[in-house]
Every structure is written in structure tokens, then in C-alpha cells.
Amino acid sequence: MDSPELTLRERQVLGIVIQSYVVSAAPVGSRYIARNYNLGLSDATIRNVMADLEREGFISQPHTSAGRVPTDKGYRYYVDLIMHVQRINDEEKRRIDADFGQLTCERKGTSTEVLFSAAKVLGTISRQLSVVLSPAFSNAVFEKLDMVLLSSSRMMVILSIRSLFLRTIVMELDIEVSRQMVDDVVAVLNERLSGLTLVEIRRTLVVRLSDCTCDSALLDRIVRSSGELFDETPMIERLYISGAEYIIDQPEFKQPEKVRDLISMIEDKTSVAKLVDDATAAVEAVKPQGMDVSITIGKENIERKAGELTILSTPYYVGDMVGKLGILGPTRMDYEHAVRVLNYMADCLSTTLSEVP
């Protein structure tokens, strides 16, 4: 980052201002720091340090207060160079394991329900808006295809993707088909496409089926529908959100216009998904202390409506596929706790999905 190096005193005072403000949501003054923290500095000295921090843009003074609050620049310096993320403690770990295990069991343990449960638990534990994006299917490996004949002109196509995910599509047919015709086409598709990525299938499907001798009408219908069958799942259909009630309850969003903007953003699920998915691509995104968590703060976010939010994003893994797990909240956030919980939840999700039957 381009910010100047701070002295030890400045780091200490900036850290205290941020930690105090995160807890109280109230501006922090020099007298409060002198009385409550044993820095060996007088009120006047702390005031001078805070003046230097303000001059450099790390803290600012709200119009109606004598205290100071962190700026985006201050939070960024704190996240990059001051905060220390400890391992998740046993109590938090037990709570996450218990809540996640119970929800997953109650919801039958399918991949979809596991993702929903992860969003629910992450929102509850972090007290922020939680977002889970299921893995993109672009590079997913096709395993097999099944067709269920619903009528002579209607069938359901079920795609099995390696690493446990399914895609189900109902197709209306302009031809009448028999069970034997369906079985023949399924056998050919599975023989010639299994083990390929969806990208490879879309690119080479016509060539791979060009010498097929089975019923051409049904096969032609499959080829014409290949964009729908083998294409990427829309981002909005990969999104699981929970915890909106927690973020709306934050002091930052008490003003009606801010609540409206926040609700509008949350309801635009495509924007929320992109915020989490794009967080790792943001210029200022960092991964603190070797942890695979990206953090974008305030105006670093591309979306204007997220200008007062912090977005944390981390990957989780399902075989060869990668999904995203995220937390959205005000910039006044307990960053250490958020990173700690997000990392552990990503590990839980990766492990659980690898065990889904």
C-alpha cells in the first residue's frame, strides 16, 4: 500500500481508535484513550498523535463530535499492518460445528442444503450479511446424464457434475419419443462426453456426435439445447444469502435513506453475488497474514452502493471446483473475528461437501 509508515505511537493509537470504535460505534477522544489504556502518554501527547493521524487521513472528525473515527484509509492500514488474526477458539469452533451439523442434518444433507446451511450459520456467527456462491460450472467435469421421460413430448434432464453437484432441466419436446430412444441417446452422450469439462462439451459437441447412428431427431434436440444444458449456471442461481436482519440493525444504517439503499442493494442479488465474486480482483484486496481472505473496504468497492461496506471473501473447494464464501458489513467491523470465522467456515464447507453422499 502507498500509505506512509507510522510510528509505534501512531500504530498504537490508530489500533485503539479502531478497536474502540468497532465496539462502541462512538467517536474516540484522546482523554478516553489516556484514561483507559496504559500507553504511558499524556492526554496532550495522544491528542497530538491523533492530529498527525488525522492530517495523514487515517482518522477523521465527525461534525458534531470532539472524538475521531477511522477512515477507509485507517481501516486499510489496520488490516494490512496492525491486526493479528488468531486461530478460532474452541468455543466458537464448537458452536459453528454444532449449528452447521444440526442444520445440515435437518435439511437432508444435499449439496444445495449444505450451502444454505453454511450461509445461515455464517450470518448468525458473524452478525453480518453472509453470502455463499456455489462453484461455477465452467470448468466442472461432466460425469453422466440421465433423462426421465415425463410424457411422450416432455422429459427431465439430470446432469451429474463430478464433485456432487446436479443440474436438473425440464425440456419440452417438439417430437414424440419412446423410452428406448431416450435410453439410446443417454448411452451415447455418456460414452462420448463423460470426463469432459462443460466448456469442452459446448465447444466440441457437434463434432463428437457427428457419426452417431442413434435416433437423430432426439439427438438434434439435445444439440440445439446444449447452451442451456451445458452452459454456466447464472450467478443469481448460485447465490445463498442470510443475515440481512443483522446488518440492517447496525447503527450505521439507522437513517431511512441509508436503510433504503442497503435494502435495495441486498435485493439486487446479482450485484451482491458480483461483489463477493469480484472482491479478490479488486486492486486493494489483501489476504492478511497468509490467510486466503480478500478484504475490500468502503470506496475500494466498485459498486457505489457498497461505498460504506467492507466485503470479505474467501474460496472453498469441492473437488476441482471453487466456490466463494463472503461477509458483508459496515466498515466498522471486528475484522479479526470476521476473518477467523470466515476461514473456519470455508474449511467446514469444503470438508462437508466432500462427504455429501
Swiss-Prot record:
GO molecular function, one term: DNA binding
Pfam hit, one: HrcA
InterPro entries for this protein: GAF-like_dom_sf (IPR029016), HrcA (IPR002571), HrcA_C (IPR021153), WH-like_DNA-bd_sf (IPR036388), WH_DNA-bd_sf (IPR036390), WHTH_transcript_rep_HrcA_IDD (IPR023120)
Single GO BP term: negative regulation of DNA-templated transcription
Signal peptide span: none
Gene3D superfamilies (alphabetical): 3.30.450.40, Heat-inducible transcription repressor hrca homolog, domain 3 (3.30.390.60), Winged helix-like DNA-binding domain superfamily/Winged helix DNA-binding domain (1.10.10.10)
Keyword Transcription in record: yes
Keywords on record: Repressor, Stress response, Transcription, Transcription regulation
Keyword match Transcription: yes
Family: Belongs to the HrcA family.
Function statement: Negative regulator of class I heat shock genes (grpE-dnaK-dnaJ and groELS operons). Prevents heat-shock induction of these operons.
Full protein name: Heat-inducible transcription repressor HrcA
Source organism phylogeny: Bacteria, Pseudomonadati, Chlorobiota, Chlorobiia, Chlorobiales
